[in-house]
Amino acid sequence: MTMSTFKRIAVTNRSLCSASLKEQVEKICKAGLCNALILREKDLAEQDYMSLAMSIKLICDKHRIDFFCNNMPSVAEKLKCNLQLSYQSFLDQKWKSGQITWVSVHTVEEAINAERLGADGLIAGHIFVTDCKKGLAPRGLEFLKEVCTAVSIPVFAIGGIDDSNSDAVRLAGAQGECRMSWYMRY
């Protein structure tokens, strides 16, 4: 796998931004720092999320960045955009969006099952120590290798990824990496 095919995925968290989220997304998209963006604003009610998603999707579309709604299938359906779901939310889904759906997994068994049930890609983590999962031991590169070997769909690593360990993630077989803090503080 060449560096050009390795996906860089921004995961939002507006509480980490010094500017507005829209300004931050514009900045990272314009700079060409990511190939995809997951709007992960867990504290928003659906209507507020929808409003934010519409404006963030416009920015992503302008810069040809793949846009994913996080755990908001009805918003993804209305906006006709990609969807990223937790494993449990994916299991609970009664319909397939028709859009690209990535699923977060934390075990090899979840990865295999998500692929069997139609996931288009997996987000595996957390791989390294991260402030987002304080007190939880990271699953590590061996876990990532096992997931990548067990499935045939793309696997993207998440959790504590930075410039010092990005190559290790790629060499473990991941087809991309997700970063939150790095993008939100860029």
State where each predicted segment sits.
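N-terminal ligand-binding/catalytic initiation module
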Residues: T2-T5, Y183-R185
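Active-site mouth loops of central-metabolism enzymes
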Residues: S4-K22, I100-V105
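Short, well-ordered coil/turn segments that N-cap beta-strands
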Residues: S4-R8, L33-N35, H63-I65, L79-C81, ...
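Glycine-rich phosphate-binding active-site loops on the catalytic face of alpha/beta enzymes
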Residues: A10-R14, K42, L85-W95, I123-G135, ...
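Catalytic domains of carbohydrate-active enzymes, especially glycoside hydrolases
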Residues: K27-L39, V75
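Catalytic cores of alpha/beta
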Residues: I28, F67-N82, H106-G118, C148-A157, ...
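Alpha-helix-loop-beta-strand connector modules within alpha/beta enzyme cores
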Residues: M50-C69, F90, W95-T107, G135-G160
